[in-house]
C-alpha cells in the first residue's frame, strides 16, 4: 500500500535499520500480545531473497544479507523481550544469506563457524515438506545445530498441490522427518498446511496428516 512506502525495502520486504520500521513492528507485536493469550509468536521472515537490494541499497549502499538479517533480527528480538514475547522465525534466511546456494543445497559437513548467527532466544524453525530420505534431514539438522540450540522443526500435511490431498507424500516425508528429529532430540515439531496453487483441496483433508504427526511423535 502507498502508505507503507516509507518503510518498504522492496515489494514484499520491510526496510531494515530504519526506526519507522521498528516502530511499526512494535505496534504489530503489541496488537498480537493484546489479542492472544500465548506469549509465543512466529515472525516469519522467510524467502526474503531481495533483502537489502531495494530502497535499502539506494539509501545505504550494499551490505551483506547475512549482516542485515542478523542485525534486523536482533532489533526485533529486543522488541519481543520488551513485550515479554518468545519469538521464532523460519530459518532459511540465516542459511541462504550466509551461503551462495539454496536452502537445501548445502553440502554435507558444511562448516558454519564463521556464519552470522541469531540470538539464543530466537527460535529457528527448519521447514521441510519435501524430502523422504533421512539423510537430507540429518544434513539440515547438523547445519541448524551449528546455528542455534533453539531449533524447531516444521513439516507438512500436503493439501496444497491440487484438487486432492497428497497423503503418500505426507506419509513418506513425515516418517523420515520425525524419525530424524527424534534421533537429534528435537523437542518441538510443527505440522503446517498451506494454501498454494489455488487452495483447491478442502482444508479438513489435512486431518490425517495431523493424526500421523501425533502418532509418530510418540511411537
Where are these regions (language model features)?
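Conserved radical SAM core fold
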Residues: 7-14, 50, 131, 158-160
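Short, flexible, mixed-charge acidic loops at enzyme active sites
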Residues: 1-5, 206
Amino acid at each position: 500500500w502507498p502508505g507503507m512506502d516509507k518503510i518498504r525495502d522492496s515489494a514484499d520486504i520491510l526496510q531494515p535499520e530504519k526506526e519507522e520500521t521498528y516502530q511499526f513492528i512494535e505496534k504489530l507485536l503489541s496488537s498480537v500480545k493484546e489479542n492472544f493469550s500465548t506469549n509465543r509468536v512466529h515472525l516469519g521472515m522467510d524467502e526474503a531473497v531481495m533483502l537489502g537490494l531495494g530502497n535499502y541499497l539506494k539509501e545505504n549502499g550494499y551490505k551483506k544479507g547475512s549482516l542485515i538479517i542478523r542485525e534486523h533480527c536482533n532489533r526485533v528480538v529486543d522488541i519481543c523481550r520488551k513485550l515479554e514475547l518468545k519469538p521464532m522465525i523460519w530459518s532459511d534466511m540465516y542459511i541462504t544469506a550466509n551461503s551462495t546456494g539454496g536452502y537445501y543445497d548445502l553440502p554435507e559437513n558444511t562448516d558454519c563457524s564463521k556464519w552470522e548467527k541469531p540470538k539464543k532466544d530466537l527460535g529457528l524453525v527448519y521447514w521441510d515438506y519435501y524430502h523422504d530420505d533421512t539423510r537430507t534431514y540429518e544434513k539440515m539438522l547438523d547445519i541448524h545445530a551449528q546455528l542455534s540450540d533453539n531449533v524447531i522443526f516444521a513439516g507438512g500435511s500436503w493439501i496444497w498441490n491440487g484438487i486432492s490431498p497428497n497423503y503418500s507424500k505426507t506419509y513418506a516425508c513425515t516418517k523420515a522427518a520425525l524419525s530424524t528429529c527424534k534421533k537429534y532430540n528435537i523437542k518441538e515439531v510443527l505440522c503446517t498446511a498451506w494454501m498454494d496453487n489455488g487452495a483447491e483441496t478442502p482444508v479438513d483433508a489435512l486431518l490425517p496428516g495431523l493424526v500421523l504427526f501425533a502418532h509418530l511423535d510418540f511411537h
